[in-house]
């Protein structure tokens, strides 16, 4: 019995020690960049000559153990970073990575699974809240605004801007992340090690986000409808123009808020049972319409009611102004192209 109690106490102590160690590691990660775990070595007293009392005879000096005076020119303290370079992770099926000072790349097979990579990348950035300063969807290239990295192993957070692009080759797709700016505390940083580190970190966040989207799609059969939705022009029984989306009502209902916000329509009240959504439309800038690859629609800014109809495996969309007037045929056809692009660029949300 005494032996069992002693073993139980040992296990409890070991468990408490492990918990304290994990808690310490999770709260303070600065040890990752410190020599010997802390900066106590900076407080070591300097060497000085031995003060021999008068009358004491010292043994003969042996130079074998002398420590010659040196002047250190290397980095010390917080200036010295012992962290290894960050590496991009090849989490996606059939992928591999390449890292260089200029950029971090993910190379994938040119397969149907990777055909929506650009929209998936945009979804990751949207969910992270990263703002875009430049976008060219036609060439699948964008430049982010400044992104602040809150990391526990940095005393002062870094801010970065990145150029993210996708290049299609015969049998390969290349996702590239390059540096467009790096600063810390308002000061520009040109250290190639830090540039490569944050390129790899950004690429890893994109890869992890895309991987989560694909895992969600594989776990949920209905999620396969997260891809682009086909939108066509049509008319109701009275001949008024409307849009036809080739997807079931439930899918369209869930996808609409993100698509509407994408084109400048702020979503208000929603009623799933009646299929109605109120929106307040404010047009995007010329550059934003251009980045979407569509022309600015001619509808007026203001409040609209969007009526969604259930057509079994399809859905109908009809916009009605606050004065109760439906769109003209021209306006309806313009929104067909706009919403088709919006559904494509918000796929996965």
Curated annotation (Swiss-Prot):
Keywords: Cell outer membrane, Lipoprotein, Membrane, Palmitate, Signal. A lipid is attached at residue 25 (N-palmitoyl cysteine). One of its GO terms (biological process) is protein insertion into membrane. It is a lipid-anchor. A lipid is attached at residue 25 (S-diacylglycerol cysteine). Residues 1-24 form the signal peptide. Pfam families: Lipoprotein_18. It comes from the Bacteria. It is found in: Cell outer membrane. One of its GO terms (cellular component) is cell outer membrane. HAMAP family: OM_assembly_BamC (MF_00924). NCBIfam families: PRK11679.1. Part of the Bam complex, which is composed of the outer membrane protein BamA, and four lipoproteins BamB, BamC, BamD and BamE. Belongs to the BamC family. Part of the outer membrane protein assembly complex, which is involved in assembly and insertion of beta-barrel proteins into the outer membrane. This is Outer membrane protein assembly factor BamC. It comes from Photorhabdus asymbiotica subsp. asymbiotica (strain ATCC 43949 / 3105-77) (Xenorhabdus luminescens (strain 2)). The lineage of its organism: Bacteria, Pseudomonadati, Pseudomonadota, Gammaproteobacteria, Enterobacterales. The gene is bamC.
